[in-house]
């Protein structure tokens, strides 16, 4: 696991599944869960973490390689899920999401910032063939970190956000 003011680990990246782990002293977050719940549990164990300790999963977009394990993890461990409204609509009938309690589903509006414990998270739009894909910037104290995936084009604005992280 690497550390730059945040602890983080790329659990998986590629067309077979994407999942990224981020930790601060107060929060443990997954960005996407594109593998089975069982596989993500195994990958978390490799970095000495447990899925029951996760506070939330942030969803970048509705493609299966980003949401495969989202539903099962949410149901089994009761964690909160965050995505923008169009992504939620696109996932509504997804076999990967299944039945998740409405109290676990939260809207993360694109272009907005949310505070999760000791970390601020900002979302931005991305160029990709999905309903409303987004990427996230994580900010804590004077540090920032960007998680950007599946983009077909890097705009000047995106480059500036990444460059300043």
Task: Please place each PLM-identified region on the residue numbering.
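Active-site metal-binding loops of divalent metal-dependent hydrolases
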Residues: 12, 33-35, 62, 86, ...
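Short amphipathic alpha-helix with an adjacent loop that forms part of the alpha/beta core around
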Residues: 44-48, 114-118, 158-161
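Metallo-beta-lactamase
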Residues: 85-134, 139-142
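Short, well-ordered alpha-helical microsegments
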Residues: 37, 67, 91, 133, ...
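Active-site-proximal loop/helix segments of hydrolase catalytic cores
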Residues: 130, 146-165
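Conserved beta-strand hairpin/beta-sheet module of binuclear metal-dependent hydrolase folds
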Residues: 1-47, 133-150
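Structured catalytic core of nucleotide-sugar glycosyltransferases
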Residues: 9-19, 56-70, 74, 92, ...
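Active-site metal-binding motif and surrounding structural segment of the metallo-beta-lactamase
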Residues: 38-83, 164-165
